[in-house]
Amino acid sequence: MEAKPFLIKPNQEELEDLTGKKFNSLSEVVDAAKEIVNTGIENVMVTLGGDGAVLVTKDKVYKGTFPKVEIKNTVGSGDSTIAGMAYGLSVDKPMDECFRLAVACGTTNAMVDSTGSIDHEILKDILPKIIIEEI
């Protein structure tokens, strides 16, 4: 990738297309994201559908998971995820908290019928239930 953006957010399928590899484990996804970070892109956040997401930075790797929820519509969840990350960054939250907000926004979007929509009451309920762990 010629441009060196601060952050990219592929889902697993998009990461496979980008790298030309098929992933069978989380460690393979993380390794591919690390390779991308080593090219000069500072952060790679990969969404994994029902398995949460992973964020690879130059110094750390985080895994984000969400509680079992009723999924109504996943359209727009990736956009909602990146919006949560962007908001967190814009208010100078630490990277792990930005990632928590990102996962919470993507999850919240999937819980409502409308596309690319966040219900703030659901978000407030989900946010503390998001588990972020350094791996």
List PLM regions with ranges.
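Conserved beta-alpha-beta core of the PfkB/ribokinase-like small-molecule kinase fold
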Residues: M1-V29
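Conserved phosphate-binding/catalytic region of the ribokinase-like
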Residues: L26-I135
